[in-house]
Amino acid sequence: MSRFQSLLSFVLVSLAAVANAAIGPVADLTLTNAAVSPDGFSREAVVVNGITPAPLIAGQKGDRFQLNVIDNLTNHTMLKTTSIHWHGFFQHGTNWADGVSFVNQCPIASGHSFLYDFQVPDQAGTFWYHSHLSTQYCDGLRGPFVVYDPNDPQASLYDIDNDDTVITLADWYHVAAKLGPRFPLGADATLINGLGRSPGTTTADLAVIKVTQGKRYRFRLVSLSCDPNHTFSIDGHTMTVIEADSVNTQPLEVDSIQIFAAQRYSFVLDASQPVDNYWIRANPAFGNVGFAGGINSAILRYDGAPEVEPTTTQTTSTKPLNEADLHPLTPMPVPGRPEAGGVDKPLNMVFNFNGTNFFINNHSFVPPSVPVLLQILSGAQAAQDLVPDGSVYVLPSNSSIEISFPATANAPGTPHPFHLHGHTFAVVRSAGSSEYNYDNPIFRDVVSTGQPGDNVTIRFQTNNPGPWFLHCHIDFHLEAGFAVVLAEDTPDTAAVNPVPQSWSDLCPIYDALDPSDL
């Protein structure tokens, strides 16, 4: 091997190591545009510190995260401006750092930076982060985020939990989101840990996840999806779910997991099978489905197994994950009274679609020119004073809230996964069930609203002043207006959420931009 080849090999290995290495809790995130080919097809993308998916951010419960976003984006097609949402964090007292463009901030301009500075005093588990401007995260600005608990109550169930046990799932498109169809009919490829194949690139590299026989692994499964849900399984292995969306659950053994856009699960895998290679499968709900040529797949490789593709076969799932079977590890009281509508403020979200835009209670969300938080800080308190008109719901403080999402054929593209910012919520009625559980339902932050006939119902307590986005996490549906803002405790929002000068500077800088620089 020549010295040059040796150096090149070292550089490539080093880059691979960098891609795996976690950053945080204090870190710079430099955003640029670069050509990438995660499935063997080259296209321009939005990358973070040179890679997509973005680097794993990691810290510990109680940490202060200081994440400096440096916007060096130059490709107008994928937007030069940006903002980043830290998905699943309560942001109590730092609503300004929640990262939703035109709800919590103005976007960051190219050539500028912005420091997201927030505390995580009482949360641990699996999170993620992504652009919250238009459909930008579909073009690559998305990555996993883990907060470790030094006193994890389930630590006895596993031996290994580290950077290498995070598994990301992403849909990948060969055309930038802004240039493709308004509602794509499916992704070109499914990426598992940033690698995958499309039907036309079946020789591309696949992700390899290594295990040692006899060890128990806590895998953290993160859906970075823009659109499809995926059914995840590992040939020859069961999975014991112990966390959903950063909430510890009672252990539940399953053999497949349907994971919707933006959801996360931790599961324990006991590497007790013969030393071999096993297919990891993540079948999307639509588009390029199946596993021909190794699409929608990765490899679980036991130490000592040959470096070849698996020959294992998929068996029919007999223990699929059912959300209604998930229960919190420690009791979490459900807000309100144990009866339908037994809350201080019930809300019903009626979905519709006109062929172009989605509507909730007859209003399609159009991002306002002044962020909702800035409107509130400027003195607007009542719903009738806040824009966009009809899309902002003012919620009283210290109150129990119930939201019902009756699924209907009037809003195609089901099931729609809905995410509430600033909270976890009790899922008192899950998709596929007509039962209400006020005793021990799962708490989470993204819920499937199911199919026509379902009436998924959630509850939470208003203990976090500020405007919080509630939206479909299919990014193409959000872009088409499938969202509302819940403005919680508007009278106390300013006092609880003091904003830094750098935040106040964002809007004047953004508003002065030429349209070609947006």
Curated annotation (Swiss-Prot):
Organism: Pycnoporus cinnabarinus (Cinnabar-red polypore)
EC number(s) recorded for this UniProt protein: 1.10.3.2
PANTHER family recorded: FI03373P-RELATED, MULTI-COPPER OXIDASE
Task of the protein: Lignin degradation and detoxification of lignin-derived products. Cleaves the C-C and C-O bonds of some phenolic lignin model compounds (such as O- and P-quinols, aminophenols and phenylenediamine). May also be involved in synthesis of phenoxazinone pigments.
Identification of the protein by name: Laccase
Residues bearing glycans: N72, N75, N229, N354, N362, N398
Short name of one Pfam family: Cu-oxidase
Required cofactor names: Cu cation
Matching CDD domains: CuRO_1_Tv-LCC_like (cd13856), CuRO_2_Tv-LCC_like (cd13882), CuRO_3_Tv-LCC_like (cd13903)
